[in-house]
Amino acid sequence: VAVDACLEQDSDSKVACETCTKTNLVMVFGEITTKANVDYEKIVRNTCRNIGFVSADVGLDADNCKVLVNIEQQSPDIAQGVHGHFTKKPEEIGAGDQGHMFGYATDETPELMPLSHVLATKLGARLTEVRKNGTCAWLRPDGNTQVTVEYYNDKGAMVPIRVHTVLISTQHDETVTNDEIAADLKEHVIKPVIPEKYLDSKTICHLNPSGRFVIGGPHGDAGLTGRKIIIDTYGGWGAHGGGAFSGKDPTKVDRRGAYIVRQAAKSIVASGLARRAIVQLLRAIGVPEPLSVFVDTYGTGKIPDREILKIVKETFDFRPGMISINLDLLRGGNGRFLKTAAYGHFGREDPDFTWEVVKPLKWEKA
């Protein structure tokens, strides 16, 4: 939310904003350089309230918790090395840090995402929906989902066969029984989300297997930015360079690097070059050009991977400043990056997710 608020007023904002929470406390800290006038405490309270943390008994009281804000400007050393204090042309802007980013795509779902991750993410979204619309009034904001899918490996491509296990652990109020929880989750969450063709008599459902989950949210567990980076990406498929996305403006290399390689991997699969692909990007701080770009199609490529890599390099501009322009990443004002903070950054049908737009890749079909 802080990223959106800054970009709405100043598209050149540089935001590296971290958040941590524990009982009755939210702390926001980091480095932000912006011309925007932002009330960070108001943002924190509104965000917590919108999530559903409206009283101490659900884990946090948005209106009465302590909010600590410690924001400084971006280091001038970083600023001069990366964007020259805003004097460099877009094609000259260097990476803001070292690191490697991965993009992944697979033809097992229409979203070109892993089915196990798509289902787990949709279950989480459905939990929020039935809590907020009152279908399951006993639900509270905290919860986790996990889906285990049985696959067939078709010469490197992953073909889903069935759902082996569905796991949902969700916070609840004191009044509901475990049997009621299980029945409601099956009827109102699992059935609307998981296609019947993937469920059978052997599918296992672990629904609140610990037996009790009343204490949750920041009261139950401390929270910190960047602790759930696999949920943000591909659910354990592909690979991850370790850098979190949330709280960072889109010029940060972890974020825009991951976005451009997702577009590249998705375009490889959507163009029929392969059924499954991973693209890796390697960066050095202050350097515009990537140190390396790597493509692996897991043996599913219609042409050799080295030829696919050549097509990718000819099609995509991996320089940081050009990524921001080509993906229109600096546009703010509509809660665009807030939407990425829950239910994943990839595989979403939303015009704001510009990195999900497929770029046609031209190649000679045999």
Swiss-Prot record:
GO terms for cellular component: cytoplasm. It catalyses: L-methionine + ATP + H2O = S-adenosyl-L-methionine + phosphate + diphosphate. ATP binds at D142, G143, N144, S210, G211, R212, F213, D221, R227, K228, A244, K248, K252. It holds the Pfam family S-AdoMet_synt_N. Pathway: Amino-acid biosynthesis; S-adenosyl-L-methionine biosynthesis; S-adenosyl-L-methionine from L-methionine: step 1/1. L-methionine binds at E31, Q74, D221, K252. InterPro entries: ADOMET_SYNTHASE_CS, S-AdoMet_synt_C, S-AdoMet_synt_central, S-AdoMet_synt_N, S-AdoMet_synthetase, S-AdoMet_synthetase_sfam. Its cofactor is Mn(2+); Mg(2+); Co(2+); K(+). It is found in: Cytoplasm. It is an enzyme of class 2 (transferase). It comes from the Eukaryota. GO terms for biological process: one-carbon metabolic process; S-adenosylmethionine biosynthetic process. One of its GO terms (molecular function) is methionine adenosyltransferase activity. Binds 2 divalent ions per subunit. The metal ions interact primarily with the substrate. Can utilize magnesium, manganese or cobalt (in vitro). Binds 1 potassium ion per subunit. The potassium ion interacts primarily with the substrate. Its EC number is 2.5.1.6. K(+) binds at E18. Its main location: cytoplasm. Belongs to the AdoMet synthase family. Homotetramer. Catalyzes the formation of S-adenosylmethionine from methionine and ATP. The reaction comprises two steps that are both catalyzed by the same enzyme: formation of S-adenosylmethionine (AdoMet) and triphosphate, and subsequent hydrolysis of the triphosphate. PANTHER family: S-ADENOSYLMETHIONINE SYNTHETASE (PTHR11964). This is S-adenosylmethionine synthase 1. It comes from Pisum sativum. The lineage of its organism: Eukaryota, Viridiplantae, Streptophyta, Embryophyta, Tracheophyta.
